[in-house]
């Protein structure tokens, strides 16, 4: 994997530096969340089995291996050519951060589950409220998709594909597509 990932969240030292540089204070709750996320451990096999149970699908092997080794993060190159446009990839979600965190796979599944096709799971945040999705069921297991929230269905989106674009057939190819 040529793309490197920066750990999600911030250390206390990083928060202190950010506060000095920006001359603004983090709210106590945000500070606590960022520190908890920063210190989230890599998942165990049992934790990933539990995640699979919660999402109702087996994780594609390549994604499971990514979580075991990296567990989400901010990619070193965060731009992606998709179709005729360049898109932003903010970060990939984590499986072991507090469930209430915006960086949590399960938090995002709970929020968005009915807004994209049921074969997909959300694995990352993209620019402007869009998502990076991964196929966990069907004939394109392991495929990476870009979900555009601005074009979503006005009713149940669990079978709606008009705002979902396949960007890569595999996670490793998706990582190779990311650039500065």
PLM regions with names:
Residues 150-173:
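Compact, glycine/acidic-enriched structural inserts
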Residues 83-85, 146, 156-158:
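Short, intrinsically disordered/low-complexity patches at protein termini
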Residues 1-131, 179:
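A surface-exposed partner-binding patch
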Residues 172-180:
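A short, amphipathic alpha-helical segment
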Residues 63-66, 145-146, 174-175:
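Aromatic side chains
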Residues 124-126, 137, 147-150:
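Structured loops at beta-to-helix junctions and adjacent beta-edge loops in soluble globular domains
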């Amino acid at each position: 994997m040529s793309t490197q990932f920066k750990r999600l969240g911030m250390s206390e030292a990083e928060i202190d530096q950010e506060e000095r540089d920006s001359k603004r204070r983090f709210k106590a709750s945000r500070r606590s969340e960022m520190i908890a996320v920063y210190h989230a451990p890599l998942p165990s096999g049992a934790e990933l089995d539990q995640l699979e149970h919660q999402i109702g699908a087996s994780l594609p092997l390549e994604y499971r291996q990514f979580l075991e080794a990296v567990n989400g993060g901010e990619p070193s190159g965060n731009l992606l050519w998709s179709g005729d446009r360049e898109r932003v990839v903010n970060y990939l979600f984590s499986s072991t951060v507090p469930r209430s965190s915006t960086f949590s796979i399960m938090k995002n599944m709970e929020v968005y589950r009915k807004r994209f096709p049921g074969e997909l799971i959300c694995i990352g945040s993209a620019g402007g409220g869009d998502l990076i999705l991964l196929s966990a069921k069907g004939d394109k297991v392991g495929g990476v998709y870009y979900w555009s929230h601005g074009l979503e269905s006005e009713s149940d989106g669990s079978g709606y594909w008009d705002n979902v674009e396949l960007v890569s057939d595999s996670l490793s190819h998706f990582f190779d597509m990311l650039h500065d």
